[in-house]
């Protein structure tokens, strides 16, 4: 979007439901975001081509309007640290995704959806789940 005029300069249609309230992670080379039904996407910033998609598991809770099963929702904003994208999902997992390739490097199950964005401070991550738990992890 052209900031001065509001004119759309570029747009991309995806075969995904983007009814999420999270903020995308915008880097020099990519735009990374969650979807309401198909996991996490990374688009090449200059071309808007899909660079990768990381699949999440079916949601434990459906939050997208007019949604039905199966959904693989990601309502949180991604954060990046040392080439890894961290993002919580509606399936109850915290995902660690290689930012370059989209390969899921690790995932941790909480048993309740993760609807809040992960906070990163130094080598520590703070994660809250929908059951009211707060976790603090040291990243490797």
State where each predicted segment sits.
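Short loop/turn segments that connect beta-strands within beta-propeller blades
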Residues: 2-6, 44-48, 98-102, 139-140
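C-terminal structured "cap/appendage" subdomains that terminate the fold
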Residues: 86, 95-97, 103
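Short coil/turn segments within WD40 beta-propeller repeats
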Residues: 38, 91-93, 132
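Blade-level signature of beta-propeller repeat domains, shared across WD40, Kelch, NHL, RCC1
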Residues: 110-140
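Extracytoplasmic beta-rich repeat domains
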Residues: 7-27, 53-80, 106-122
């Amino acid at each position: 979007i052209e900031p001065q005029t509001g004119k759309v300069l570029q747009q991309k249609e995806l075969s995904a439901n983007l009814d999420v309230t999270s903020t995308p992670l915008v880097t020099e080379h990519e735009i990374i975001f969650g979807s309401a039904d198909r996991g996490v996407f990374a688009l090449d910033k200059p071309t808007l081509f899909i660079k990768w998609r990381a699949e999440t598991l079916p949601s434990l809770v459906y939050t997208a309007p007019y949604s039905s099963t199966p959904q693989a929702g990601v309502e949180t904003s991604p954060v990046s640290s040392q080439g890894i994208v961290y993002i919580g999902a509606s399936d109850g997992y915290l995902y660690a995704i290689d930012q370059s390739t989209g390969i899921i490097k690790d995932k941790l199950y909480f048993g309740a959806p993760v609807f809040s964005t992960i906070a990163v401070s130094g080598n520590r991550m703070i994660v809250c789940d929908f059951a009211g738990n707060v976790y603090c992890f040291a990243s490797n």
